């Protein structure tokens, strides 16, 4: 089974190409041109590229190159004959067009060689099946005939080799004892201390002697290692007659030092935060500058190098192969041509956690974009669709509006008012944790932060924010900022109106001169009407500068449902004429999904809003900005 067969001129014009199993022959052919033809390494007509074996034939008279590719694990004996037959027939059939040796004549020439090639391929395959009848192998040709006869004879009373090896240690203990022998079985000459040779009636081959010498050498050194191991074990003193008590896994612990809880503690005071490991809390990296998200790995780097090979080849061809860059247009794409490829792409996107409806819409958009487009000769339907899909995904992840919080905060400072950010989302996605990360990032950039605890529903929500505030205060104490308090928690306990607490927090921040107010809200499901009404009221009354939706990178179809219903609820329950909707997205738990990054596509596609932050860990420095190309590369990785 052939992957491809192509015929092109040394000027770079593809005259004819047959696509078999392989999706595209561009990469292997470019590698052949760069590594073999341009380097004048044509001594061998075979070349291996990744999983393919390429065989080629040069026609120096007409400046043609014939290349065939197939899987390197296959042994196709008819390939050489096929290349010769194709070369001969193609040259004779199109001699007139080829002899003109001009690019225009080759462009205008019609090389309808498909039927002839299939006929030659069928004849070559049939000829390879006609072989001489196989004969049965003789005993002299077998491996058993090459072994010495002595090695296949088992003497009565002789133990097999494996049992003899296992019983060597037991027999060594009995050696040197004064008692009578435990057995009277005859010992073969090869296992006794007697020399083995013709004088004892045993003849061994040269290979058998070498093998026995090797075994004796290994046994001598093995005994030395056993003695050294025994000596090291015996060095450790052991108490005789005493047995260490067994410690059960779930049996508790009776150690007094472990059970003693009477030591004084600070019970969560700020002094306890100062004694904690600051580096462990802070994490590694520069907190003031957001790094781009990196989704690559060692496999991705290798794939990236392979993907850059065709482009590098195009830059180095020059001269003789300078016209290789898509001068010939072969066919225009239709929906029937792209149907099977788009089905595979859709399944691939769904497997990478893209919502099913959005995957269908993306493939439909690509089909509309490519319908009627003319492909290049070396371009296949798969490569063309994949390239168009990649461009569409990058465009989706780069929306028109870009959220620059630092610039907006500086603008709010000039107006002498705090910059207000509200966090919303479903339960358990990490709103409070990522609020603390963003607080640390703002503190590293020199802005003071007031955290408003407006989650008055979940037990422990205020205590969680108090812990983050204490740790952030330890990282940025007032002493480092001229006595100015950089981070503070504003809370009114549980059961209060969240909108009223947010309003008081904003007024407090304005009076105390805080730069940013981060409002934490309670987690709520998108179908909970009372809680969604309370959220819409909070946003309408306080009019924050930025509304961030916090979502997990683990969700698939659920992401679409969450965002659609959140926006719908904010619009339905808002009392303003122009309701305030979600402005941006914070994508959390991105370090747990490997390359299944489809949630980023789903959330951005459904809202047309940017992903402002990406959470990648559990320390304050584990905050990244989205790199669209890295996400798309991870998404398209097979």
Swiss-Prot record:
One Gene Ontology cellular component annotation held by this UniProt entry: membrane
Polar residues compositional bias, start-end: 304-314
Compositional bias of kind Basic and acidic residues: 137-146, 153-165, 204-239
Xref: InterPro entries: AAA+_ATPase, Longin-like_dom_sf, P-loop_NTPase, Sig_recog_particle_rcpt_asu_N, Signal_recog_particl_SRP54_hlx, SRP/SRP_N, SRP54_GTPase_dom, SRP54_N_sf
Phosphoserine, modified sites: 177, 296-298, 473
Keywords noted in UniProt: Endoplasmic reticulum, GTP-binding, Membrane, Nucleotide-binding, Phosphoprotein, Receptor
Keyword hit for Membrane: yes
Region (Disordered): 132-244, 283-316
Membrane topology according to the record: Peripheral membrane protein
Main localization category: endoplasmic reticulum
Residues recorded as bearing Phosphothreonine in the entry: 284, 578
Residues that hold GTP according to the record: 425-432, 520-524, 588-591
Any Pfam family: SRP-alpha_N
PROSITE patterns, per database record: SRP54
Family annotation (SUPFAM superfamilies): Domain of the SRP/SRP receptor G-proteins, P-loop containing nucleoside triphosphate hydrolases, SNARE-like
Top-level taxon in the UniProt lineage: Eukaryota
Molecular function GO terms recorded: ATP hydrolysis activity; GTP binding; GTPase activity; RNA binding; signal recognition particle binding
Chain spans, region NG domain: 419-636
Coiled coil stretches, renumbered: none
GO biological process: cotranslational protein targeting to membrane; intracellular protein transport; protein targeting to ER; SRP-dependent cotranslational protein targeting to membrane, signal sequence recognition
Location in the cell: Endoplasmic reticulum membrane
Subunit structure: Heterodimer with SRPRB. Interacts with the signal recognition particle (SRP) complex subunit SRP54.
Family indicated by similarity: Belongs to the GTP-binding SRP family.
Domain comment quoted from the record: The NG domain region, also named G domain, is a special guanosine triphosphatase (GTPase) domain, which forms a guanosine 5'-triphosphate (GTP)-dependent complex with a homologous NG domain in the signal recognition particle (SRP) complex subunit SRP54. The two NG domains undergo cooperative rearrangements upon their assembly, which culminate in the reciprocal activation of the GTPase activity of one another. GTPase induced rearrangement of SR drives SRP-mediated cotranslational protein translocation into the ER.
Functional note: Component of the signal recognition particle (SRP) complex receptor (SR). Ensures, in conjunction with the SRP complex, the correct targeting of the nascent secretory proteins to the endoplasmic reticulum membrane system. Forms a guanosine 5'-triphosphate (GTP)-dependent complex with the SRP subunit SRP54. SRP receptor compaction and GTPase rearrangement drive SRP-mediated cotranslational protein translocation into the ER.
Listed name of the protein: Signal recognition particle receptor subunit alpha
Species of origin: Homo sapiens (Human)
